[in-house]
């Protein structure tokens, strides 16, 4: 991936706020997982039910460790860290200290390790996992253009990368403890 001035500017804004960016699945809104103010901004922007929680994206399991219950078996940690051919979100036991902003009312936390170059760049340059959610208002279709982003969010986003390089399919979701696929 070529790191251009737009990506560097997105990184700058990601450190303190909410950006719109392509992911390995859909066009999304993102912020640092360790920034409660930005997480609350996403909840407010999307008019999102706070009981739902978010997906955490990371380029490596090390970025997810502060959020996952450390009592999970080493076998499950190995499975979580293993690369997958298809974008796969795992539901994992959450840390006892986890902010309710991240998992909502859920007993499990949604996490995805991705080799997406943009997410990798963001994680490695911030030292943090990212919150990920679709770029839409709750119950509406995902934005696929800057015009739709403006309709949904006005000028509330800190920065927007163009939605020109994403896959339009959501990830599959698997409960890591039971192996049951829910999407």
List the model feature ranges, each with a label:
Residues 1-183:
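Active-site-adjacent structural elements in enzyme catalytic cores
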């Amino acid at each position: 991936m070529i790191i251009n001035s737009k990506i560097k500017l997105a990184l700058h804004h990601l450190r303190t706020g909410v950006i719109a960016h392509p992911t390995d699945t859909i066009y999304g809104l993102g912020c640092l997982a360790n920034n409660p103010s930005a997480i609350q901004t996403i909840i407010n922007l999307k008019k999102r039910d706070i009981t739902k929680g978010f997906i955490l994206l990371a380029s490596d399991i090390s970025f997810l460790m502060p959020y996952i219950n450390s009592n999970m078996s080493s076998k499950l940690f190995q499975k979580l860290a293993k690369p997958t051919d298809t974008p796969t979100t795992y539901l994992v036991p959450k840390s006892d200290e986890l902010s309710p902003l991240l998992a909502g009312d859920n007993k499990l936390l949604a996490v995805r390790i991705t080799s997406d170059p943009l997410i990798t760049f963001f994680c490695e340059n911030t030292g943090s996992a990212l919150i990920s959610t679709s770029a839409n208002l709750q119950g509406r279709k995902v934005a696929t253009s800057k015009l739709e982003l403006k309709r949904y969010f006005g000028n509330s986003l800190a920065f927007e990368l163009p939605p020109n390089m994403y896959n339009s399919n959501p990830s599959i979701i698997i409960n890591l403890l039971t192996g049951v696929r829910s999407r």
